[in-house]
A protein has these predicted regions:
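Short, charged recognition helix plus adjacent turn
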Residues: 71-96
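Short, conserved catalytic or interaction motifs in soluble domains
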Residues: 49
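Short alpha-helical DNA-recognition segment
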Residues: 27-46
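Positions in alpha-helical segments
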Residues: 17, 21, 42-45, 57
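Short basic helix-loop element that most often maps to the first helix and adjoining turn
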Residues: 17-33, 61, 93-96
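DNA major-groove recognition helix of helix-turn-helix/homeodomain DNA-binding modules
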Residues: 57-78
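A short, Lys/Arg-rich alpha-helix, primarily the initiator
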Residues: 1-26
Length: 96
């Protein structure tokens, strides 16, 4: 069984690699994303530039925003292994 922290780190990296493109697809700024997920624009900027670590709560909030739109939901599902890793982590969290 893979370490859940390693899986989360891989998920964070995969999301961060695509975050500017996902935001562009929705036509939203860092500020708008921040309002939607309940944090500051500075936090989104720092996380996107990898100057600050992403929390699991922020990760899930961002996923929720992009899951609402069909095109960005498809983009997330097209990231190799992303859905599988996310399901593994979520199933582990539920089983605790």
């Amino acid at each position: 069984m893979r370490d859940m922290n390693d899986l989360k780190s891989e998920l964070y990296d995969q999301l961060l690699n695509e975050l500017p493109v996902l935001r562009a697809r929705l036509g939203i700024t860092q500020e708008v994303l921040a309002l939607k997920v309940g944090c500051s624009r500075q936090t989104v900027n720092a996380v996107e530039k990898r100057k600050k670590e992403m929390t699991w709560q922020l990760f899930m909030a961002i996923i929720a925003v992009f899951n609402l739109d069909e095109s960005t939901r498809k983009m997330l599902s097209d990231i190799p292994g992303f859905s599988e890793k996310l399901n593994m982590v979520l199933n582990e969290e539920i089983d605790r």
